[in-house]
Amino acid sequence: MNYSNIIQAIRSIIEKEEEILLNLPEEIITNRFNHQNRSIKMLLGHLIDSASNNHQRMIRLQYAPRVGHCIPNSERGMLVFPDYTQDNDLWIQLQDYQHEDWYTLVQLWKFYNLHIIQVIQSVDETKLDNYWLDYEGNQVTLHDMIMGYTEHLELHIGHIHELME
């Protein structure tokens, strides 16, 4: 499977946004909040958490013994990841992104996404149909995760830009 469009989209976002983010004044990144009560720092932290969780999923989904089957899990017999979707505000709070050094956050976001590109480029194509169960019990394939990665990234970059205005 050729994911060059996804890879190029991630690269383009990084190249475009890094400089913009690094040049934002402290007052804008910490004192403006969206409808979810998230600052720009918190939104970027959420994107780091998303990269982290998706990284784990992309790697672990390649362990599966057969295409289209879940990896055995002692609790439920299937690969089930912790419910990050329902806990992402708690992740933001516990990591205290609001008080993190901005340069560090931007660089972590950048380099985690560059690593995601490496993971996507190296994915075992025989494992693309392997899936995990989300918190609602829906099957999510490795292929679907890769295809949907930039949509989530672009969504929250858009939220950041709304707060910049």
Residue ranges and their predicted role:
Residues M1-I28, D49, N53-R60, G148-E151:
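Alpha-helical bundle segments that constitute or directly flank the non-heme di-iron/ferroxidase center
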Residues N2, S39, L94-D101, G137-T141:
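Short amphipathic alpha-helical segments at helix-loop
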Residues Y3-I6, K16-L21, N31-H35, D89-L94, ...:
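Short amphipathic alpha-helical segments, especially helix-boundary/capping motifs
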Residues S4, Q8-R11, K41-G45, Y103, ...:
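A generic "alpha-helical surface" signal
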Residues A9-I13, F81-D129:
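Acidic/histidine-rich alpha-helical segments that form the ligand environment
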Residues T30-N88, L114-I117, Q121-S122, D129-E165:
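Short, contiguous alpha-helical
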